[in-house]
């Protein structure tokens, strides 16, 4: 079987990621904002006796650019570690796309032009004379639709023919293809004239996108609409997620009781019920909320709305020292900090990139969501829970803006750069791809629950049960004394004075420390530490009830505020260190976020006390 290595190249928003999904059935992220493919990604497919390895390179407008994505693409193409270049173009916006195509031709490699979104071009009355394009660019042209999978088999056939044919260097149809000004202006003129020959509009261009934009990015209505959509997302995240949560919680409680009642060895029964089931179950409990949140974010991305919000918030972000493009990493941070940190590569200015890296942590990631849902469900009525959840996320964003202003005035001074960003057309989401985006997130969440969090739960259970107490543990007070004398209890009592001003007990203090590894571990830790009271008080036989009974509301407020701001998980911290480039920035992140969290939590504690008195 022969192997063909394909470099998939194109400008942002031309559908490269969608194409690689269609060709290789790869579950890759697809979005409508610049830089969705931050790193080189690959997938494989097989056709006839050939194995195709498709390298999805970051979207780039030019090979002359200096952003991280453009550097990655240029470096890969200059390495010659591929057989064929497949240049993907947007058939509805061909003229702009051809500039990159001309630059790619100057590499003098085997290249094929794939005109994507031809189905949309036909709907808009756009006709393309591909014979002229093929002749002028001395390359094969294939009209395809990654969305409907039209002509994808033909594309593979053309790639095979190109791969098997002997490469004949092209005659230079235009000399200064990759030169800079003033020749670059001549290239633009050439592309413009060529486009007039290739492109024919049979009817007026549809202006549906403009009509929608007139409302969604309106000067007065745009921001309220965005806030309403965010409120609706968090409202649905809590209210819809609550329905399966009750069944999942009941199932794990029943399973734990079954294990305790049917395993005679109390040591093994406790390890399984109080360690694994209580710890892992407490994390899996919030899977529905996680899936609903990621579904909402995926829909906003794939429809093209997120790019509009970046434009809408540019003025506000600039006032706080952030760049308009910072919005993309920031909104990604609501899902997970790891891809959010990586998405800062779209920012060319180093100061803007570093500032955005620091502020991302204030955007509550999906791993923090279970903590919020747990505490909101414990202390507030369910009909208002969505409002409180929305308020927590908005408060985190506001604190992030304040932190950005502070850092811009101190550590990251510099001039603002202008904001230029492409506005893609609105598109109906591809439900198959949206599902796989959500499925992948859920799969990662469950994988973490079944590996890392399972081990953490066992470790926490062991540390909270040893050394063994000689007392009769049928008494609740004896159980409390036993856990306080355990290794975990001794550690918790040791760090308790640090968190005493926040009025957090040693159990919450230990939960915060465990959250440095992964925020989900906090839920697992509380699930183990607070599970002792289950057998004693039957009216509070779930984690929410136990927390509501044992933690005062002001302390709960302080805990939530601390969780909202302090250092990201270990995996995200490693990525932050890599993206920032220096260890000193990682140390500063830890000190800055933990100090900010402590101050905000202290203020929140006393405000809550005043309001409750």
Curated annotation (Swiss-Prot):
The chain crosses the membrane at residues 220-240, 266-288, 290-312, 322-342, 357-377, 387-407, 444-464, 510-530, 556-576, 587-607. Residues 3-165 form the FeoB-type G domain. SUPFAM superfamilies: P-loop containing nucleoside triphosphate hydrolases. Pfam families: FeoB_C, FeoB_N, Gate. Disruption phenotype: Loss of 90% of Fe(2+) uptake into the cytoplasm, reduced growth rate in iron-limited medium, strain NCTC 11168; in iron-rich medium Fe(2+) uptake is not affected. Reduced survival in human and pig epithelial cells after 3 days, strain 81-176. Reduced ability to colonize chick cecum, strains 81-176, ATCC 43431 and NCTC 11168. Outcompeted by wild-type bacteria in infection assays in piglets; the 3 different strains colonize different regions of the gut differently. It comes from the Bacteria. Changing residue 500 to K: In strain: F38011 and M129. GO terms for cellular component: plasma membrane. Changing residue 605 to F: In strain: M129. It is found in: Cell inner membrane. GTP 1 binds at residues 10-17. GTP 3 binds at residues 56-59. Induction: Detected in iron-restricted, mid-log-phase cells, part of the feoA-feoB operon (strain NCTC 11168). It is a multi-pass membrane protein. Keywords: ATP-binding, Cell inner membrane, Cell membrane, GTP-binding, Ion transport, Iron, Iron transport, Membrane, Nucleotide-binding, Transmembrane, Transmembrane helix, Transport. One of its GO terms (molecular function) is ATP binding. Its main location: membrane. InterPro entries: Fe2_transport_prot-B, Fe2_transport_prot_B_C, FeoB_GTPase, G_FEOB_dom, Gate_dom, P-loop_NTPase, Small_GTP-bd. Belongs to the TRAFAC class TrmE-Era-EngA-EngB-Septin-like GTPase superfamily. FeoB GTPase (TC 9.A.8) family. Fe(2+) ion uptake in diverse strains of C.jejuni is much lower than in E.coli and H.pylori. Site-directed mutations in FeoB cause no defect in Fe(2+) uptake. Probable transporter of a GTP-driven Fe(2+) uptake system across the cell inner membrane into the cytoplasm, shown for strain NCTC 11168. This is Fe(2+) transporter FeoB. It comes from Campylobacter jejuni subsp. jejuni serotype O:2 (strain ATCC 700819 / NCTC 11168).
